[in-house]
């Protein structure tokens, strides 16, 4: 499975490296499809090598490559609720 991190992620979040985001994707703790989006996007939380939780949003390109176009740490409260990590 090919995975790429959109360059904008690293520009907007200099506290994250490409390796951090890829590791978090590979070590996903939880993910859900966002059914209302077209093309379908997935929201996920995973941990990087330092144990930080990273929120990610990705979609699958037509060639099967996953493109992570949003990542940040720590995850937002909205994402934690959406993925059932915390209650409202």
Segment roles from a protein language model:
Residues 1-88:
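Ribonuclease/tRNase effector modules and their secretory precursors
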């Amino acid at each position: 499975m090919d995975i790429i991190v959109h360059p904008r992620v690293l520009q907007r979040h200099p506290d994250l490296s490409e390796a951090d985001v890829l590791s978090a994707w590979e070590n996903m703790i939880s993910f859900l499809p966002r059914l209302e989006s077209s093309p379908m996007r997935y929201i996920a939380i995973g941990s990087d090598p330092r144990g930080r939780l990273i929120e990610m949003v990705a979609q699958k390109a037509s060639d099967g490559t996953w493109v992570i176009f949003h990542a940040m740490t720590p995850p937002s409260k909205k994402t934690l609720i959406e993925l059932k990590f915390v209650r409202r």
